[in-house]
Design a protein with these regions (language model features):
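Short, electropositive alpha-helical surface patch
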Residues: 104-108, 137, 197-214, 270-292
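Hydrophobic faces of well-ordered beta-strands that scaffold small-molecule active sites
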Residues: 25-29, 86-88, 119-121, 145-149, ...
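Conserved C-terminal portion of the radical SAM core fold
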Residues: 169-228, 244-267
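N-terminal [4Fe-4S]-dependent radical SAM core
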Residues: 1-87
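Core AdoMet radical
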Residues: 53-73, 77-100, 115-128, 144-170, ...
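Acidic (Asp/Glu)-rich catalytic clusters
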Residues: 77-79, 106-114, 134-144, 176-180
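Auxiliary Fe-S-binding modules of radical SAM enzymes
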Residues: 2-14, 18, 23-25, 215, ...
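Short amphipathic alpha-helices and their capping/turn segments at secondary-structure boundaries
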Residues: 74-77, 128-142, 173, 202-212, ...
């Protein structure tokens, strides 16, 4: 049975401790970006599940400078525990959807902070022009740069329903160009999307096993107030996963994943004041404890059912 310290999967915490020699925390930053799915280039309503905060509901205020955002969050986190190293995580909206000189300014400012050891950027694969790729490769030579791509699913019918706005070939092209610059790529997937059963979700996992990715986020579908997804939910067009269904699904995904892929998330944090369903998702610690307990009982671990092609 494979284990990574105390966990039956290749956790981000394990990877960070190996790379940096101690526990490392992320500080969620707001670069003041928008998204082509919101500003009219592709659409105006965003992805069907996306909140008004653009998935950055826990990020700092864009009214503050990058340095001020980092310092504010470090002060808050360091009051609870001794921490010396942090990852600057640009999370809200699409964090390469801006002129390259603006991106150079904010990313360089983040990496120049003495307590920041790496940069993580959430974006879309259709927002990575050649000039931005050159910038990211340049920054990656100074400190590690990770790029998180929101794939969600490989299935085109689901992608159309959630208004993802790009083809799978676009993802593959962006991935190849990022890896040519030795930039680590994290893929964001959503479990529980309408029309996505276990087999379809595992098809996405099997596809990602064949790609040159370094990390993955397994995100539970959250129905958030004010989204178009919430309107469909309230019409009874789909139901959300219950807790046991979700844990079974996560275990399946982990068992089928390559053991080298780092697990950046196995559930998710939806803002409690916006969460409509599933309400059990707000008890994140309880969900994680149950997942670990169930995996131990079943002798389950990442890669258990992975078969190299």
């Amino acid at each position: 049975m494979l284990r990574w310290n105390d966990k039956p999967y290749h956790s981000l915490d394990h990877m960070l401790r190996e790379q940096f020699g101690e526990k490392v925390y992320r500080v969620a930053l707001n670069g003041g970006m928008s998204c082509p799915n919101r500003d009219g280039k592709l659409g105006t309503r965003g992805c069907i599940f996306c909140s008004q905060g653009g998935s950055g509901d826990f990020a700092a205020s864009a009214a503050l400078s990058v340095t001020e955002q980092i310092d504010t969050q470090i002060r808050s986190l360091s009051r609870k525990r001794p921490i010396h190293k942090y990852i600057a995580y640009f999370q809200a909206y699409t964090n390469t959807y801006a002129p390259v000189e603006y991106l150079r300014k904010i990313f360089t400012e983040a990496l120049s902070h003495p307590d920041i050891v790496a940069l993580s950027i959430g974006t879309r694969p259709d927002c990575l022009g050649n000039d931005i790729m050159e910038l990211l490769c340049s920054l990656n030579r100074a400190k590690p740069v990770w790029v998180e791509l929101g794939l969600q699913t490989i299935h085109q019918d689901t992608a159309a329903y959630i208004r993802r706005g790009y083809e799978l070939s676009c993802f593959e092209d962006a991935l190849a160009r990022l890896r040519s610059g030795n930039i680590d790529v994290i893929v964001h997937t959503i479990l529980g999307l309408p029309g996505e059963d276990r087999n379809r979700i595992l098809e996405t996992i099997d596809y990602l096993n064949r790609q040159d990715i370094q990390g993955i986020k397994l995100q539970l579908l959250h129905v958030l107030r004010g989204t178009d997804l919430a309107a469909d939910y309230e019409k009874g067009l789909f139901s959300t996963l219950d807790r046991d269904e979700y844990i079974d699904l996560v275990m399946d995904c982990l068992e089928h994943l390559r053991p080298d892929i780092v697990i950046h998330r196995v559930t998710g944090d939806g803002p409690k004041d916006q969460l409509i369903a599933p309400l059990w998702a707000s008890r994140k610690r309880e969900v994680l404890n149950l997942l670990h307990h169930r995996m131990k009982e079943a002798d389950s671990f990442q890669g258990k059912q992975y078969q190299k092609l």
